[in-house]
Amino acid sequence: MKLKKQIRFYNKAMSRTALNELIRRLIDRFGMMCTSHILDQLKTLGFHQATDASFSLGIDDLLAAPSKWWLVKEEDQQGFFSEKQNLSGNLHTVETLRQLMERWHTTSEYLKEEMYPKFQLTNSFNPVYMMSFSGARGNKSQVHQLLGIRGLMSDPQGKIVDLPIQGNFQEGLSLTEYIISSYGARKGVVDTAVRTADAGYLTRRLVEVVQHIIVRKTDCGTTQGIFISPIQDRDRSKENVFLQKITGRVLADDVYINRRCIATRNQDISAGLANQFKNLLIQAISIRTPFTCKSLSWICQLCYGRSLSHNNLIELGEAVGIIAGQSIGEPGTQLTLRTFHTGGVFTGNIVGTIRAPFNGRIQFNSNLVYSTRTFFGHPAFICRKKLFIIIDDGGDKVDYSLLPTKSWVFVQNHQYVESEQLIGEFRTTTSLLKEKVLKYIYSELNGEMHWSTFVCHALKHTQGNAHFTFGAVHLWILSGGIYNPKVVLSFPFPKDQDQVTIAFLSTKQKNCFDPSVNLLQSNSVSFQNPKLEEEKLEEEKLEEEPDQSSISVPIFLENFNIQGKKQINRVLVPFFYAPKRKTKRKKRKNYPNCILKIPRSGFLHRNTTFCIWNDSQYKSPSPGFLEYSDSPEKFVLIPEEVHFFEKSSPIAIQNKSIIRADTQITAKKKSQVGGLVQIHKKKTKLVVKILPGYIDFYRKKNKKYWYKTFVSPRQNLGEDFLSEKNYFQTLNKPHRKKSFVLLRTAVEYKIPNPKEIKVPFCPDLLREEDNLHIQMSNCFYGDGGKKLQKGIQLIQTCLIFNWEQIDSTESETSISITSIRIKNIVINTIQFSLRKHSDSAWSQKKNQISSKRTFPPVLDKTQSFSLSGKIQLPSNYTATFRSLNNEKNMFLILSTSDCFRIHLFQTKKNDNIQNKSNPNKPINNHFVGFFGHLHSIENLYPSSHFLNYNKILFNKFCYNFNIFEIPNCYILDEFQKVLIYPRINHLWNPKKMRYRRYSKNRYPTMNLGQLLWENFAICKNESFSESGQIIAVREESLVVRLAKPYLATPKATIHGNFAEIINQGDPLITFFYERFKSSDITQGLPKVEQLAEAQSNNPVVQNIEENFRIWNQDMTRTFGSFWGLFISTKITMEQGRIHFVDQIQKVYQSQGVHICEKHIELIIRQMTSRVLVSDDVIFNVFLPGELIGLSRAQRIDRAFDEAIHYKTKLLGITKASFDTPSFISEASFQETARVLAKAAIQGRIDWLKGLKENVILSNIIPAGTGKKTNYSLFARRRRRKQNTKTRKNNLFSLNEK
């Protein structure tokens, strides 16, 4: 009867957790003996009930959820859509993986929650349901893998495998699913032998660190403790954690409530007292921990607290260090071996959602949000501050919601939302710890790499080829095969990215080249001129700065004859390009030099200089200055010799002296000419000028002598003096009455007539007075008297492109370049095409700059090239040649497998194509052709690229404009918009039509060189099947080069340079992204080992450094530099220890394992018990860099006057194992020879205070019953010392008497 009054009656199902709680309360109330009898009765009752029920588990008891298959099917469809988005470049690999994990986790959780209600409705006595629900065997996750889906698994490195297991153990797994499942299983294909060894090694290191810690004293006398507050933890799970932390501890200070003491110091905390603290909402209580124990190599009873075995204070002599190491290592071993753990995806419910309660229009402040991209690649907004959201249905219903800061908003302002539509997400709890992860993306194709904007062109590292992005950017790999012949090919092209059509012939065929091959359309004439490539020299620098608005291309030319004709509105100009060479060659012939100036926009306006002609005979042979004579057709160059020296250089000649040629100026410099010397200073340099010529002294001033004037050859200057093409200059000396003149030699140049200059262009182009024509004019270097240096071009002939302005419409000229080289034959062609701006729908905006590369025209005929090596390749290859690593014999071939052709209008219903025209009624408008050329069209269809499916009708009504029927066609142009007009019999005025009226029927622009994504719609019923680049446009089809787009987010790293050749499998992009730490210890305890070894990437180590910096700033301002540093160090170490314990505890708690924090604190205490000496102020005590105990450093610091400078050191468990008081224990752990040799040199003494060293030497261990023997041994030694001191004192006292 007494027993019934003391125990409450529980009328509920007893799960494993409830049974553990019952046993704990029975032990607290009745003790161990009575509790054992009660548990025996429960055991007998359980066996009887199991025998009467006769439950058995069969395969028929496994009931699968009926909704599994349609959920999996829907998931596959969403996965297919995400994969298409990834292939199109809208999502990158990380976002695709995140979407995959999120979808399958949602599906798995839905099936898991649906499983148990089904058991309750169908059969509540199902053996599987009762077994897992009661906690007797199995849990929800394990039953879910039996009946639902296995889900996503991780590989041996802990990364998620992106192929989910859709089957379960009831249905069976396929071979692929079994291989993936074995990664997370205990005995599969991937064996756990290595992981078992790692787990055992972790336990061994933990025991090695704390094996010497034994309870040897009741109280150490400390007054310090750590504070724990229950106010911070309001939810039930956190309250249970608070009770687990303080139960079994000892109070470090009295606890008061309203001046009434409810617990005293050194009182152990029972379960009842802990609940009382929780219910009374105590602010904070101070408890004793192993961190605050004063003992050196042991621990006292009160700092340890109660024993976990009998729930009383720990007994003296208990080896708590061994228990602590085993309690941490053994759960990790079990989890690693998958004894009671199943693999899966770690996730947490940390996101809350807000959905629309009804249909309505949403309103919020748009200034409080900014656009961003979610982790899954979806567009969204982020709240800068708290955001109020209002949903109004237009009637009486109004809903108000509040989103906290940093929440996601998935709708726009004033958007209409439907009921249950997702509006936003916010975090419901504190976010988990994150870690930075690198994700590498590799190329799937061979080809060229290209990107658009938002890529920094400066290299991330000087010695590397990595570029970082500052915005979302698409990276394209243009397909192409890399060809490396065994012999050196003889037809390298002069520039990269030139596209030609090549027929590879046999090696026996001779070089064949047809100069009359037509490069353009049927109504045009091509100019081609074969020329043997001359020897190249280094290009000389020009003094003028380059124009940033144009591209200057140096061209090396030779006079030759050109035959051909010019078409209206189109001009072709051939030229030859001379690349720069570093090696010096033989002296080249005196050929003119030409610089082609092409605007970056690709367009020329009227009266614009497009080419500068430099004749080498008009280059200054030496320094000097220019002077213009009286004749307008001549100018002269007065040469002089100039030298620059340092101010400290010794000069052997004097100023205003006259020297001869080869006179020594300095020790290493001689003059080349003779003449008058002029020396002056210029900033930090000394300038020495030698004016060549000769002096003429005269006594009487002759009026014919003029200062700085020209004199003609054989001119009489008086006194029978005749000049010979000299420059006349008088020089007066002030100290002499005589004067003299300096007659300097001048080089005379004749200004050429522009019409007489022999330029390499066709003479007909300069003489014909047509719409397009080229004008020539001379440009001089500068005014008279301007000084110049050697190699300056004195006269430049400028070629100006011009045309007649026919009407008020503005015009401009587009430029196209074609360059081909076969062996030593170089063919370069520039094409100028006149274009006009009109008001029609397909005209572009004025001065629009095309960002696309200018492509050469499509070749109408296939040119034949020959090889000098023995190579045979398939014919009709369209190749884009790119050199690799400066190796000329390697190039990129664009074969038919890298391209595909799209035929336009294949799906039209009307297949009766009529390509007719009415020659009697021409159209006076100008239409744009394929290659950006304007045509004045009289016969519409032969000269413009239209495909018509309806009869053509043209009627001319008046002079100002034309009205005609719109055919069912569209215009495709390199620069213009692509418009489609499907309506028939619609009359329109092209000069009055505006762009916005036809915006609904307009399709995206397609240009040559344009990059297009997969499923890009080119018309109503046509789309691209794969991503690629348009490389050719024909009347009936497009040729598209295969390409693969990759999306790179901001702060990503791109490996490689623009237009670089990439092989399949080469790294392209490196993503830096954050993911939540799973704290999974199933792969050899990586997280626990990372924390225990105190690695540099450990978040605890990083937080300690950051906290010290913050505390040091605050304490220094309050207490000064010295005390601030001391206090901040102490606070930082205490907080770091507590944070260390919390992190290790979270790892185990995530797997459902709880470890007593006292055991973790013992490990952390040993890891933080060493300091590093940083200064050798006290000699012969410690060496700089020596590791010593913290308590020892504090004792010596108090004993000496001068302070010891040291800093705290966080040691990993492996290094802490080599820094113990016993060298015998260290030698038995690792590196036996090194440890024993070092101990012998240092003369270390092992006092045999630990367990391990006594076991090695076969002594009685100082724990348990052996503690008395150890204590008596130390007591006898202490009494001997005292007796020795007493005898010595008595002896001294007798001698004094």
UniProtKB/Swiss-Prot annotation:
GO molecular function annotations of the record: DNA binding; DNA-directed RNA polymerase activity; zinc ion binding
A UniProt-annotated Pfam family: RNA_pol_Rpb1_4
Keywords: Chloroplast, DNA-directed RNA polymerase, Metal-binding, Nucleotidyltransferase, Plastid, Transcription, Transferase, Zinc
Keyword Chloroplast in record: yes
Gene3D superfamilies the UniProt entry points to: 1.10.132.30, 1.10.150.390, 1.10.1790.20, RNA polymerase Rpb1, domain 3 (1.10.274.100)
GO cellular component, one term: chloroplast
EC number: 2.7.7.6
Biased composition (Basic residues): 1278-1288
Keyword Electron transport part of the UniProt annotation: no
Top EC category: transferase
InterPro entries: DNA-dir_RpoC2_beta_pp, RNA_pol_beta''_euk, RNA_pol_Rpb1_3_sf, RNA_pol_Rpb1_4, RNA_pol_Rpb1_5, Rpb1_funnel_sf
Binding site for Zn(2+): 220, 293, 300, 303
Subunit relationships: In plastids the minimal PEP RNA polymerase catalytic core is composed of four subunits: alpha, beta, beta', and beta''. When a (nuclear-encoded) sigma factor is associated with the core the holoenzyme is formed, which can initiate transcription.
Functional summary from the UniProt entry: DNA-dependent RNA polymerase catalyzes the transcription of DNA into RNA using the four ribonucleoside triphosphates as substrates.
Homology family: Belongs to the RNA polymerase beta' chain family. RpoC2 subfamily.
Protein's name in the database: DNA-directed RNA polymerase subunit beta''
Taxonomic lineage: Eukaryota, Viridiplantae, Streptophyta, Embryophyta, Tracheophyta
Chain's gene name: rpoC2
